Amino acid sequence: MALRTRLGEILRPLNAEYGKVAPGWGTTPVMGVFMGLFLVFLVIILQIYNSSIILENVDVDWVTVN
């Protein structure tokens, strides 16, 4: 028989839903939307870093950072 500890009793509710899966697609479409938005964010950051997007009056030179 497994040893019962106070920490185990506290953490037991967190493991109560183990193995249960929501039927159907669940929240997959929401995750897809957020992944798409994150991809757009990364592309914008990459284009700013690569100077593909020209920002008016913003100098993207490492010398000016110092």
UniProtKB/Swiss-Prot annotation:
GO terms for cellular component: chloroplast thylakoid membrane; photosystem II. Disulfide bonds: none annotated. Pfam families: PsbH (PF00737). It is found in: Plastid, Chloroplast thylakoid membrane. The chain crosses the membrane at residues 29-49. Its main location: plastid. It is a single-pass membrane protein. GO terms for molecular function: phosphate ion binding. The keyword Ligase does not apply. It comes from the Eukaryota. GO terms for biological process: photosynthesis; protein stabilization. Keywords: Chloroplast, Membrane, Photosynthesis, Photosystem II, Plastid, Thylakoid, Transmembrane, Transmembrane helix. Belongs to the PsbH family. PSII is composed of 1 copy each of membrane proteins PsbA, PsbB, PsbC, PsbD, PsbE, PsbF, PsbH, PsbI, PsbJ, PsbK, PsbL, PsbM, PsbT, PsbX, PsbY, PsbZ, Psb30/Ycf12, at least 3 peripheral proteins of the oxygen-evolving complex and a large number of cofactors. It forms dimeric complexes. One of the components of the core complex of photosystem II (PSII), required for its stability and/or assembly. PSII is a light-driven water:plastoquinone oxidoreductase that uses light energy to abstract electrons from H(2)O, generating O(2) and a proton gradient subsequently used for ATP formation. It consists of a core antenna complex that captures photons, and an electron transfer chain that converts photonic excitation into a charge separation. HAMAP family: PSII_PsbH. This is Photosystem II reaction center protein H. The gene is psbH.
